[in-house]
């Protein structure tokens, strides 16, 4: 066998090996995304959620307001601690939403393991002015009630509210770090605004 023939045979073998390896790499890379997408689809589901007209105090990592949510396959409301991405809630409005819910892999310990996104708003119904919302056993902590001098108003867990004529909001505010539990009654004023009607 001549030296030239030997070199040609080695070159041919090398070319075949390169093509074979390239083909394997291409096959593996195309299969992986397909499997990943299949898993993502399996973990995502669409649901219909009913959202109540008022938010409820709750405690996750810290004290906050939680939406009252009732999926269409459940009979009672439960508290939703996380966000609904793409949805802007307004107090005094009842909503029916179509949402997608998916699992979150490797979520932080203080975060939800589920991601909820707004798909569509099916209906919105506003409460009548004067509708009352009673929040029971509110634990008064430092950030439960905030008074903003610049805005000249109070906030309850981030939600602005006004004080009706005969309510002593100053006294209530002075109790915010005592840990006392109080019942708060808010009244709907229209345009997503609320006023504190009573506390005890």
Predicted regions and their residues:
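N-terminal post-signal-peptidase region of extra-cytosolic proteins
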Residues: 76-87
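Short, Lys/Arg- and Gly-enriched loop/turn segments at beta-strand edges
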Residues: 104-115, 191-198
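Bacterial N-terminal signal peptides that target proteins for export
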Residues: 2-12
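Short, basic/aromatic beta-hairpin or loop at an interaction surface
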Residues: 65-76, 156-161
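C-terminal motif of bacterial Sec signal peptides marking the signal peptidase cleavage site
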Residues: 20-23
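Bacterial signal peptide processing site
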Residues: 25-28
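Flexible glycine-rich surface loops and low-complexity tracts that mediate binding to linear polymers
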Residues: 95-104, 176-191
């Amino acid at each position: 066998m001549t030296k030239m023939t030997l070199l040609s045979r080695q070159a041919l073998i090398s070319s075949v090996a390169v093509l074979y390896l390239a083909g394997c790499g291409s096959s593996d890379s195309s299969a992986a995304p397909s499997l990943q997408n299949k898993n993502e689809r399996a973990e995502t589901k669409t649901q219909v959620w009913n959202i109540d007209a008022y938010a409820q105090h709750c405690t996750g990592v810290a004290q906050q307001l939680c939406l009252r949510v009732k999926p269409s396959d459940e009979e009672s409301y439960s508290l939703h601690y996380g966000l609904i991405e793409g949805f802007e809630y307004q107090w005094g409005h009842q909503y029916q939403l179509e949402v997608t819910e998916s699992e979150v892999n490797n979520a932080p310990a203080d975060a939800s393991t589920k991601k909820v996104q707004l798909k569509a708003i099916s209906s919105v119904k506003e409460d009548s002015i004067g509708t009352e919302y009673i929040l029971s056993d509110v634990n008064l902590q430092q950030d439960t009630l905030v008074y903003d001098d610049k805005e000249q108003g109070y906030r309850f867990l981030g939600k602005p509210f006004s004080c009706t004529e005969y309510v002593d909001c100053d006294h209530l505010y002075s109790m915010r770090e005592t840990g006392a539990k109080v019942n708060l009654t808010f009244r709907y004023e229209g345009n997503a605004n609320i006023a504190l009607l009573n506390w005890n």
